[in-house]
């Protein structure tokens, strides 16, 4: 294949999987350049990272850098997004989407440090990730070339990729038996492909990688006590934790009880729809806790505004627009709204459900004295009449004019 640009040194986002194992020798052959592998540890698991540096070198990389991004990802990307209440298309807690900007940012930093003049990713031309990576690259390193092999090469199947490596005597642990495409980090794991490609097929047990089947979960419920300060979880079950520690702890609880499963068909940015089974056990529990405290402390107008910001934020994050003025502004607005989101929540975990059973806050606007259905001495119900007449005045005038 002809070179599109002259490249001397490229940093490739490397996962150790089949695609990126092929990309390293392919880059050397087609761009005649030095290839440096960059691995982002975002909590995908020790098994995924074991021996990954040696694997990258064996594939032809001159160096391999591994960056531990777990704590930063949760504290600087996931927790701020949670404050917006973002749920893409009403269900998805954006597990893959939120990991991409920090990976791209760290990849750019490595490129700067080693003097690279190009960046490379292994995203396909059908998905959202190519846009997320390249959108971040454009915002952070517009001077660097971007190489997207899946949009250039003529390899079209796993079999061809395996043959490519075998012809070059490059070791690879991948096989043809892989049916599902999975992406995991500390926050979630996604499963796509296989039986899920037909929306009339019910997900089978292979579609769920982490969580216990809710029907097989313990028959005894379990409660967790969560402390929230300024819209972020700071302690669980009486123990102070970092954001990443919170996620790890609540993942363990949620996995055990089958919490956090969704099976959705979503609108990709590239125009097509895709189906996936997503598991976000700890994140589901955290989200329930934050929304419960918001119910107590946000007034009607603030709550409505936060909901609007959450919808917009979900699309910005999903669409790879993290490094934009609008996303920065929304995060700043929800950070301000979160200043009073302080409180304690108790959540019961039982067979796939995370149910808030108790909540309290020193900033609560809820008043039992005002809200009671019994007798009270603080609320004069006759005052409502004047308010209703003014509130409905425009409707009254419109009706009178139509006669």
Curated annotation (Swiss-Prot):
Positions bound to L-aspartate: 124, 128-129
Gene3D superfamilies linked: Argininosuccinate synthetase, chain A, domain 2 (3.90.1260.10), HUPs (3.40.50.620), Single helix bin (1.20.5.470)
EC number: 6.3.4.5
Enzyme class: ligase
Keywords: Amino-acid biosynthesis, Arginine biosynthesis, ATP-binding, Cytoplasm, Ligase, Nucleotide-binding
Annotated CDD domains: ASS
Membrane-traversing stretches: none
PANTHER family cross-referenced by the UniProt entry: ARGININOSUCCINATE SYNTHASE
Subunit structure: Homotetramer.
Family assignment from sequence similarity: Belongs to the argininosuccinate synthase family. Type 1 subfamily.
Designated name of the protein: Argininosuccinate synthase
Organism: Aliivibrio salmonicida (strain LFI1238) (Vibrio salmonicida (strain LFI1238))
């Amino acid at each position: 294949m002809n070179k599109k640009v002259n490249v001397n040194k490229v940093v490739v986002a490397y996962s150790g999987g089949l695609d990126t194992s092929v990309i390293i020798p392919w880059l050397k052959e087609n761009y005649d350049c030095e290839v440096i592998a960059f691995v982002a540890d975002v909590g995908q698991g020790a098994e995924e990272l074991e021996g990954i540096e040696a694997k990258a070198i064996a594939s032809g990389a001159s160096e391999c850098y591994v960056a531990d991004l777990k704590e930063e990802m949760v504290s600087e990307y996931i927790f701020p997004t949670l404050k917006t209440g973002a749920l893409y298309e009403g269900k998805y807690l954006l597990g893959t989407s939120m990991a991409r900007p920090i990976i791209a940012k760290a990849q750019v930093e490595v490129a700067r440090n080693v003097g690279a003049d190009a960046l490379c990713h292994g995203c396909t031309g059908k998905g959202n990730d190519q846009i997320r990576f390249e959108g971040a690259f454009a915002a952070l390193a517009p001077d660097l070339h971007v190489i997207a092999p899946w949009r250039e090469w003529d390899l079209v199947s796993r079999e061809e990729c395996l043959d490519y490596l075998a012809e070059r005597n490059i070791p690879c642990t991948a096989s043809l038996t892989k049916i599902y495409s999975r992406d995991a980090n500390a926050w979630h794991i996604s499963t796509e492909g296989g039986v899920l490609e037909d929306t009339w097929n019910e997900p089978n047990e292979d579609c769920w990688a982490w969580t216990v089947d809710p029907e097989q979960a313990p028959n005894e419920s379990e409660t967790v006590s969560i402390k929230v300060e300024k819209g972020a979880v700071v302690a669980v079950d009486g123990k102070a934790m970092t954001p990443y520690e919170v996620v790890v702890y609540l993942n363990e609880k949620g996995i055990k009880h089958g919490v956090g499963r969704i099976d959705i068909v979503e609108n990709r940015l590239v125009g097509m729809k895709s189906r996936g089974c997503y598991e976000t056990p700890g994140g589901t529990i955290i989200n329930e806790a934050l929304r419960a405290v918001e119910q107590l402390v946000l007034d009607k107008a603030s709550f409505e505004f936060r909901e609007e910001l959450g919808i917009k934020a979900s699309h910005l994050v999903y669409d790879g627009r993290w490094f934009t003025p609008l996303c920065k502004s929304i995060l700043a607005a929800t950070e301000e709204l979160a200043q009073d989101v302080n409180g304690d929540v108790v959540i019961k975990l039982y067979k796939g459900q995370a149910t808030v059973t108790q909540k309290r806050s020193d900033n609560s606007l809820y008043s039992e004295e005002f809200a009671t259905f019994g007798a009270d001495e603080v609320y004069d119900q006759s005052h409502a009449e004047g308010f209703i007449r003014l509130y409905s005045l425009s409707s009254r005038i419109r009706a009178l004019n139509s006669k």
